[in-house]
Design a protein with these regions (language model features):
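PRPP-associated nucleotide enzymes
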Residues: 1-152
Length: 152
């Protein structure tokens, strides 16, 4: 998937003087990425019982994937890691636990990007610790420096 490159200096969220470039998908690219993910998930044979959207970037893709996979059971979970643009805390902290019981369930975790992979690793560990039978990760974008490679 090719996303548009944006200059952070032009964005209102960018701290003054920070030279940073990032990619921003449009709605069609997000939807097309979700179709690609749904096809990969179906082809793999993985059939999630619960889809967990990681707040906030994973909410929209999780909702779209729920339609594409025919799974209406969507939950949410929030992890705090970024303090500001390009500035992280020492470690991710789960600030909102998953909004449903996952014990014995196959769970698909959805986020927009696997950046460092720290947040997604924390989410996977937490869900397995809560008794999920299987946890798979799907992201629209994957950065090579991520410590976690998404399943989809």
């Amino acid at each position: 998937m090719k996303w548009l490159k944006r200059d952070c200096a032009l964005q209102p969220v960018c701290p003054e003087g920070l030279a940073l470039s990032f990619e921003v998908p449009d709605w069609n690219e997000i939807y097309d990425g979700c179709i690609e993910l749904a096809n990969q998930i179906k082809k793999s044979g993985f059939n999630p019982e619960i889809i967990v959207g990681v707040a906030r970037g994973g909410w929209i893709p999780a909702r779209i994937l729920s339609d594409l996979l025919g799974n209406t059971y969507v939950a949410s979970m929030k992890v705090e890691f970024y303090k500001d643009v390009a500035e992280t805390a020492k470690k991710p902290v789960i600030s909102q636990q998953v909004s449903t019981a996952v014990e014995g369930k196959r769970v698909l975790v959805v986020d927009d990007v696997a950046d460092t992979g720290e947040s997604l690793t924390t989410v996977r560990r937490n869900l397995l610790g809560r008794g999920a039978s299987q946890v798979k990760i799907a992201t629209l974008h994957y950065k090579p420096q991520s410590i976690l490679r998404p399943d989809f």
